[in-house]
């Protein structure tokens, strides 16, 4: 019985014993390409030539044993990113539990960049939630690079290949979101000028999430309009990127305008970003947010003003604010007036 360390979301511990796969799993997390690389002995770009069911096993998830089918897949390799350099075909094993869990299936014809872990001379999927990420058939790199940078080059190729479908491009952006390097940011900037609206907005949201505000102005008009149904997901991602990533004081003028958006999530993200700047230039915008129709936005304004002006005693907990909202709003409105 040998230990097989697989990443399942954040981590998984697994045991291989006589064809059975026994895993102690945590809930699936976001894709983390750097972690996926670290847990993989081989990374190959290619296409699945065949998949065969080879037996039965057991998967234990959160202390519950679940029966699973064992499969063997044969991968036709286009190029190796990490691992045996001369491989043209690779075989690996994966498991699909009988119960509905977030393991990804693998089928003949599936293509991409596959991440594999070697145990006793056999390859297994490194992460059943993310067995592969986006890649295209052709991608040339003229210089030797660290593995993370090589993976980034592959994702960039997936974004710039004119024959790549939109689903591949969106998958590449999802993977690039977790790579916090300059080459990854540069690749996202290319995607941010894509003729595809879905690709462009997804890339801009990813850039905002890393405090890259060069394209914030290009989505300002969209965020200031009522959200059309098909764009709901895109606007939510943009608002989330602003909330979690933007802290550059140069964004303050646009953030102030976004406080007038008809969409609550956009206003909330803008208020949080103003707070995150930590700049005295954000005070005017936060003062405006004190009058927002949504309590969450008003609370962010109060906390942001307290942090920026270093008045900790007027930065209440959410519970304290809920009980005494009028008291805190009155203080900050009067304070703002006194500064004029």
PLM feature segments, named:
Residues 164-167, 182, 197-198, 228-233, ...:
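Alpha-helix N-cap/helix-start positions at coil->helix boundaries
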Residues 95-175, 182, 193:
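Extracellular C-terminal loop/segment signatures of secreted glycoproteins
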């Amino acid at each position: 019985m040998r230990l097989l360390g697989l990443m399942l979301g954040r981590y998984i511990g697994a045991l291989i014993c006589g064809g059975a796969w026994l895993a102690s799993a945590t809930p699936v997390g976001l894709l983390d390409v750097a972690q996926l690389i670290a847990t993989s002995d081989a990374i190959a770009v290619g296409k699945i030539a065949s998949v065969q069911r080879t037996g039965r096993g057991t998967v234990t998830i959160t202390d519950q044993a679940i029966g699973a089918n064992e499969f063997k897949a044969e991968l036709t390799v286009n190029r190796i990113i990490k691992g045996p350099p001369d491989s043209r075909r690779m075989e690996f094993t994966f498991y699909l539990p009988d119960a509905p869990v977030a393991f990804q299936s693998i089928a003949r014809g599936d293509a991409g960049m596959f991440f594999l872990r070697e145990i006793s001379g056999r390859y297994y999927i490194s992460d059943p939630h993310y067995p592969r990420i986006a890649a295209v058939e052709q991608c040339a790199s003229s210089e030797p690079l660290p593995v993370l940078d090589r993976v980034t080059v592959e994702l960039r190729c997936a974004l710039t290949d004119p024959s790549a479908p939109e689903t591949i491009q969106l998958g590449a952006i999802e993977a690039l979101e977790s790579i916090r390097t300059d080459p990854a940011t540069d690749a996202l900037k290319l995607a941010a000028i894509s003729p595809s609206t879905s690709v462009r907005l997804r890339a801009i949201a990813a850039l905002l999430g890393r405090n890259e505000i060069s394209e914030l102005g290009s989505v300002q008009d969209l965020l200031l309009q009522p959200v059309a149904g098909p764009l709901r997901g895109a606007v939510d991602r943009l608002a989330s990127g602003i909330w979690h990533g933007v802290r550059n004081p140069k964004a303050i003028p646009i953030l102030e305008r976004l406080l007038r958006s008809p969409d609550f999530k956009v206003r909330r993200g803008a208020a949080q970003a103003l707070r995150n700047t930590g700049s005295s230039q954000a005070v005017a915008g936060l003062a405006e947010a004190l009058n927002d129709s949504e309590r969450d936005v008003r609370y962010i304004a109060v906390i942001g003003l307290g942090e920026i002006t270093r008045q900790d005693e007027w930065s209440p907990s959410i519970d304290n604010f809920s009980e005494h909202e009028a008291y805190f709003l009155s203080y900050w409105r009067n304070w703002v007036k006194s500064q004029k």
